[in-house]
Every structure is written in structure tokens, then in C-alpha cells.
Swiss-Prot record:
The keyword Oxidoreductase does not apply. CDD domains: CDP-ME_synthetase. The record marks 15, 24 as: Transition state stabilizer. One of its GO terms (biological process) is isopentenyl diphosphate biosynthetic process, methylerythritol 4-phosphate pathway. HAMAP family: IspD. This is 2-C-methyl-D-erythritol 4-phosphate cytidylyltransferase. It comes from the Bacteria. It catalyses: 2-C-methyl-D-erythritol 4-phosphate + CTP + H(+) = 4-CDP-2-C-methyl-D-erythritol + diphosphate. One of its GO terms (molecular function) is 2-C-methyl-D-erythritol 4-phosphate cytidylyltransferase activity. Its EC number is 2.7.7.60. Pathway: Isoprenoid biosynthesis; isopentenyl diphosphate biosynthesis via DXP pathway; isopentenyl diphosphate from 1-deoxy-D-xylulose 5-phosphate: step 2/6. The keyword Nucleotidyltransferase applies.
């Protein structure tokens, strides 16, 4: 399979409360930056042939240097992000289209991922890519742990309680057959219609397209607030311990 990854890493992380508009993707977990962990996972996924990353203009040299030092050979382009996340993804799609015209090769699927989700695993990337090609679209999600309620007509009071059994919390990478995602972004740009994730674009412009749910564990968190760093360090240690245990078991067998 020929899969392409788009990584959105343009956010300034207001909720992270970083000084001087710092970039949350450059925060360290386990001695390595968040974006390093993210890039490494896609580098190690066999189906991923090319990676496109959108970031702030001033961060482009830093990302390129990091990728070179970490041997991220699949990083095809680092492009300037847009005003909104959707604009950043669209900038990457346009770069993919340029490469397609030059090479004559269209990726089978495109996976769109948040740069601030450092714990996606290569085997999960592979499965999402496979399901995206099979069904046309696939989005990872987790079951909510908390009860979720609507806000009432008076915003200071609750409305109805939602059935938790019919709810999921959506994550990334979200995978789509290439033409589906490209056309959804083209139509959204033409209409000036914005959403917070790519699945919503497909739902709007291709309502007949079913989106496969890929249920995930709770490790694939998005680094958003200062508290997430503490949680991320614990997840990193757990993943490291599991990896070492797996390696030792394989050596003993």
C-alpha cells in the first residue's frame, strides 16, 4: 500500500500557556520532543511512503533539522500552516497534488494526524491505513469515560443526558482514500466551510460515505494543557516498559 501522512503542527498552544508563544510540539517527553515521537511513529509504519508536515513559518527550519538528525527519511515536505487547522491540512494536500503531477503517482490513502498526539503506534497506523483503503474512510476513537450532558437553554443549567453507549471521542490519524479527502477539501475551500476535523468534511460533502470506527486505547492523547505533560510522561514510561517486555519475551522464545 502507498499511504501518505499529513501532520498538523501549526498550533500555538494557547491552553498550554507557553511563554512567548512557544510551540507545544517542541515540549519534551522522555527526553524527546513531542513532534519527534509523532514523526518516528509514521517513519516506522511500513505503509507510509511520504510525510507532509504543516507548521508555523518560523518553525520550519527547526522541524527540518530535527527530522534530519532523527533520520526521518519519509518527510517529503514541511509547509507553512494556515490560519486554521483546516487551512494547514489543505496546504499539505496542495503539496501532495504537486508531487502527484510530477511523479504520476497518487497515494492510495491519506492519513491526517495531530502533531501533538505523540503516542500513536506504527501498528495502529497500519491498521487505520488498511481500513481506510477497504472502507474508504476510517477514524480512531475511544469510549468516553465520563457521562456527557447537553447544556440547557439556560447555559448555567444542564439539559438532557446523552446515551454514553452511542458516543465516542474522535482522535487521529483519520484516514481516507486520497480522492475522497482531496475533493472534500476542495469543496470546503470553495464554500468557505470549516470544521474541526477532516471526517466532518467528508460527512458534509459525501454523506453517503460510511466512516469505519477504529476503537483505540486511551494512550493516544493530545497534548493540550499543562496537565497533559504529566500524563504523557506516565504513558511514555508505560509504553517503554511494554516495549522492553515484548523484546525480552521475543528474545526468550
Amino acid at each position: 500500500m502507498n499511504a501518505t501522512a499529513i501532520i498538523a503542527a501549526s498550533g500555538i498552544g494557547k491552553r498550554m500557556k507557553l511563554a512567548n508563544g512557544g510551540c507545544k510540539q517542541m515540549l519534551e517527553i522522555g527526553g524527546f520532543s513531542v513532534i519527534y515521537h509523532t514523526l518516528k511513529a509514521f517513519e516506522q509504519a511500513p505503509s507510509i511512503h511520504n510525510i507532509y508536515l504543516a507548521t508555523r513559518a518560523e518553525s520550519i527550519p527547526l522541524i527540518q533539522e530535527l527530522a534530519a538528525s532523527a533520520n526521518i527519511g519519509k518527510l517529503t515536505a514541511v509547509v507553512e500552516g494556515g490560519k486554521e487547522r483546516q487551512d494547514s491540512i489543505n496546504n499539505c494536500i496542495k503539496a501532495i497534488e504537486v508531487k502527484r503531477h510530477q511523479s504520476g503517482v497518487t497515494p492510495d490513502v491519506i492519513l491526517v494526524h495531530d502533531g501533538a498526539r505523540p503516542f500513536i503506534q506504527p501498528e495502529e497506523i497500519e491498521e487505520i491505513a488498511r481500513l481506510s483503503l477497504l472502507f474508504g474512510a476510517c477514524v480512531p476513537a475511544t469510549r468516553p469515560k465520563d457521562t456527557i450532558k447537553f447544556i440547557g437553554h439556560d447555559p448555567e443549567f444542564f439539559g438532557e443526558t446523552l446515551d454514553r453507549n452511542r458516543l465516542v471521542q474522535v482522535q487521529t490519524p483519520q484516514g481516507f482514500r486520497s480522492e475522497l479527502l482531496m475533493q472534500a477539501h476542495q469543496q470546503a475551500e470553495a464554500e468557505g466551510w470549516y470544521s474541526t476535523d477532516d471526517a466532518a468534511l467528508v460527512e458534509r460533502f459525501f454523506p453517503q460515505q460510511l466512516i469505519k470506527i477504529f476503537e483505540m486505547g486511551y494512550h493516544n492523547i493530545k497534548i493540550t494543557t499543562p496537565e497533559d505533560i504529566l500524563v504523557a510522561e506516565a504513558i511514555y514510561q508505560q509504553l517503554q516498559a511494554h516495549g522492553n517486555a515484548t523484546s525480552e519475551a521475543a528474545s526468550a522464545s
